[in-house]
From Swiss-Prot:
PROSITE patterns: RIBOSOMAL_S13_1 (PS00646), RIBOSOMAL_S13_2 (PS50159). Located at the top of the head of the 30S subunit, it contacts several helices of the 16S rRNA. In the 70S ribosome it contacts the 23S rRNA (bridge B1a) and protein L5 of the 50S subunit (bridge B1b), connecting the 2 subunits; these bridges are implicated in subunit movement. Contacts the tRNAs in the A and P-sites. The lineage of its organism: Bacteria, Bacillati, Bacillota, Bacilli, Lactobacillales. One of its GO terms (biological process) is translation. Part of the 30S ribosomal subunit. Forms a loose heterodimer with protein S19. Forms two bridges to the 50S subunit in the 70S ribosome. This is Small ribosomal subunit protein uS13.
Length: 121
């Protein structure tokens, strides 16, 4: 089982799909990384040679993935909250950030319904 960017890639899958298990790597990024590394997309993860693994690791070094990407996203959200922007306020209050309606929906973001004492149907 190959370990790339701190992630154990699943056995038996094509390498282009296995790379998508890394946070920050989708199918398009995986294809670009494999093209830069000179590794065919249809090769299975089990069939990778150590040289191919090293080439993939080297090509992935130029892409922000895993911890670095998570840290950057969290810092961006913290920055929005600190400067008091509309988006930052929505993050702070736990409400949808991108303009969704909150009158009826948004249960995922708002959490479980709070029951109101004394309210009749």
């Amino acid at each position: 089982m190959a370990r790339i960017a701190g992630v154990d890639l699943p056995r038996g899958k094509q390498i282009v799909i296995a790379l998508t298990y890394i946070y920050g790597v989708g199918k398009t990024t995986a294809q670009k990384v494999l093209k830069n590394a000179g590794v065919p997309e249809n090769v299975r993860q089990d069939d990778l040679t150590p040289e191919q693994e090293d080439k993939i690791r080297a090509a992935l070094d130029s892409v922000k993935v895993e911890g670095d990407l998570r840290r950057e996203v969290n810092l961006n959200i913290k920055r929005l909250m600190e400067i008091g922007s509309y988006r930052g306020i929505r993050h702070r209050r736990g409400l949808p950030v991108r303009g969704q309606n909150t009158k009826n929906n948004a249960r995922t973001r708002k959490g479980k319904k709070a029951s109101m004492a004394g309210k009749k149907k």
